[in-house]
Amino acid sequence: MRHAEVSYVDSAGAPVKPEEVPLTAAGREQAAAARDALAGVELDLVVASDLPRTAETAAIVAPGHEVERWPELAEWRGGRLDAIPPDELETSFVGALQVKDEAQRFLGGESLGEALDRVHPALERLLARAWHTALAVLHGGVNRIVISYALSGDRTYFGTFEQAPACLNILDLGEDGWIVRTVNYVPYEPLHPARTTTMEHLWEQLKPFLDERQ
């Protein structure tokens, strides 16, 4: 699943460090909805990245379980927005997770190829563990990498599906390979009334600050 809602801007609209943000009040409610959706599921293993927003989500969704924190499963690392030409910034930002070439970089930071090199070995290490049902609380970009691997079995990356806050993805792995059962199920809004992507929503939050800076 993806972590629940956070805010990447402070009360004044200025960006905050993404590696430090906690869940919002709405995010905690979203995580509780995911917990309720999984109430009948017996979890053998709970994994999160090393960032607070995934660990906090995991603690709400799977109370009583130890949460293993894996830094290799942190979100794609972006670069500096001021290094992107202003006339290209909006297009680059809202399409940052829809890259097609391994050399393309996430907002000027980590490339797709580098992210694959980091996430795929961690996924294989997770699969080598002995468990029946595991919960991995991760990030939108990392989830896309994992689901793409389940669909393709190789380094193919599909960036054009959405990962809403606190969404659930259900993947099975058996002797005959992967079965992708559910992608982007949102317990608190199952019909997806929002028409913006998560990156478009984040752009709307950041744009006033970026406009003032120019």
Q: Where are the regions that the model predicts?
A:
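Short catalytic/ligand-binding loop motif for oxyanion handling, primarily in non-cytosolic enzymes
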Residues: 7-9, 54-57, 76-79, 144-146, ...
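Acidic, low-complexity terminal tails and accessory targeting/binding regions
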Residues: 76-87, 149-214
